[in-house]
Amino acid sequence: MQMPRRFNTYCPHCNEHQEHEVEKVRSGRQTGMKWIDRQRERNSGIGNDGKFSKVPGGDKPTKKTDLKYRCGECGKAHLREGWRAGRLEFQE
């Protein structure tokens, strides 16, 4: 799917329409200290593993877009709900 890199849209911080630049959100670093990771570590041992004994489900064929819209006027960014797209390319 083709999408323009810059376009006019509403900025919730300026409370008016401004030109925004679109960028893909990069995932942050994962940590092993999340509650689910600690629970998995606690429950691993002898006996039934409960919900961890189930086979994890597979991936969907397409992923939802994860985009950040940065305002050209105030410089603040906001997120919006994504949609399913096989491939997302930006037009200059």
UniProtKB/Swiss-Prot annotation:
Its cofactor is Zn(2+). The keyword Zinc-finger applies. NCBIfam families: PRK05767.1. GO terms for biological process: translation. Binds to the 23S rRNA. Binds deacetylated tRNA in the E site; when the tRNA binds a stretch of 7 amino acids are displaced to allow binding. The keyword rRNA-binding applies. GO terms for molecular function: large ribosomal subunit rRNA binding; structural constituent of ribosome; tRNA binding; zinc ion binding. Residues 22-63 are annotated as: Disordered. Zn(2+) binds at C11, C14, C71, C74. Keywords: Metal-binding, Ribonucleoprotein, Ribosomal protein, RNA-binding, rRNA-binding, tRNA-binding, Zinc, Zinc-finger. Part of the 50S ribosomal subunit. Interacts weakly with protein L15e. Binds the E site tRNA. A zinc finger (C4-type) spans 11-74. Belongs to the eukaryotic ribosomal protein eL42 family. It comes from the Archaea. GO terms for cellular component: ribonucleoprotein complex; ribosome. It comes from Haloarcula marismortui (strain ATCC 43049 / DSM 3752 / JCM 8966 / VKM B-1809). This is Large ribosomal subunit protein eL42. It holds the Pfam family Ribosomal_L44. Binds 1 zinc ion per subunit.
